[in-house]
Design a protein with these regions (language model features):
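Catalytic-core "active-site belt" of small-molecule-metabolizing enzymes
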Residues: 1-75, 117, 127-133
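Glycine-rich loops and low-complexity Gly/Arg-rich segments
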Residues: 63-65, 82-84, 92-93, 126-128
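A conserved acidic, glycine/proline-rich C-terminal tail/linker
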Residues: 80-110
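Conserved catalytic-core subdomain
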Residues: 102-133
Length: 133
């Protein structure tokens, strides 16, 4: 089994050093603008819930900024993870136990500044908050 459990509540912290217009070479040079992740929520077995129907709210300072449903990620978040596993396999590389794989965001980026609190709420699957100090 590729996945023992999921953590549905996650906030990806983006720190793009390059501004528009961005080309793919800019994204690669900027390490995909990845600065970190905050993971929370309760662990969920991959067969416990139909992931396509997982909805989420992204709030900044208690105001809803973005909403979405996981089916917005290629129709099902597992499809991108399966593609990645297959692509890595074609290069004799494998996903290993303990690897964290982000399946894709189903909301747009919500910008934060010093003092802001972001809260991602996935209903019964949990939530996570982060304060920027």
């Amino acid at each position: 089994m590729l996945c023992r459990f999921l953590r549905p509540a996650l906030i990806e912290i983006v720190d793009a050093r390059l501004q528009d217009p961005r080309k793919i070479v800019d994204t690669v040079a900027d390490n995909g603008a990845a600065a970190g992740i905050v993971i929370g929520g309760r662990p969920v077995g991959p067969m416990e819930v139909d992931l396509r129907w997982v909805g989420g709210l992204m709030m900044r300072n208690s105001e809803i900024e973005e909403t979405g449903v996981a089916a917005g990620v290629l129709g099902h978040p597992a499809l991108g993870v399966a593609w990645l596993a297959n692509k890595l396999g074609s290069h004799d590389v494998a996903l290993e136990p303990g690897h964290i794989v982000l399946a894709g965001s189903f909301t747009r980026v919500v910008f934060a500044q010093k003092g802001d609190t972001l809260h991602a709420d996935f209903g019964s699957l949990g939530g996570i908050a982060v304060q920027f100090i």
